[in-house]
Amino acid sequence: MILAIDTATDWIGLALHDGAAILAEFGWRSRRTQTIELAPAVAQLWGRTGVAPADLSAVAVAIGPGSYTGLRVGLALAKGLALAHNLPLVGVPTLDIVARSVCRLETDLVVVAQAG
C-alpha cells in the first residue's frame, strides 16, 4: 500500500494505492493552512479505509516545484512516516503529477506552469 502526498500547490491531494488501483483519495483546496490540515486529513483517510501506517509499503511525496511552505509540510510528514515505519520514501516531481493527471498515454509531455 502506497500513501501519496501532494502539497505543492493550494490543491492538496492524498491517495492510497494498493499496487493495482487507487483504494481511496482525498483532495481539497487549502488556504495556506497545510500545517494544521495535513496530518488530520491523513488520519481521516486511514479511518475511512481501515488502513494503518503498518500496512504501508512506501510513501510518495511531491517534491516541487511548488509552494515552499506546502512542500516542506508534505515532505516533513512523508519523511516522518517513512522513518518511523522504515518505509521507502519516493519523491515525485510536481510537473510529472500534473502531466499524468491530464494524460495517461505513454508519450512525451510538456507542462508549462505560471510562476509567481
PLM features: what roles do these ranges have?
Residues 9:
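Short, glycine/acidic-enriched loop or turn micro-motifs at the edges of active sites
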Residues 3-4, 12-116:
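Nucleotide and nucleotide-moiety/phosphate-recognizing core
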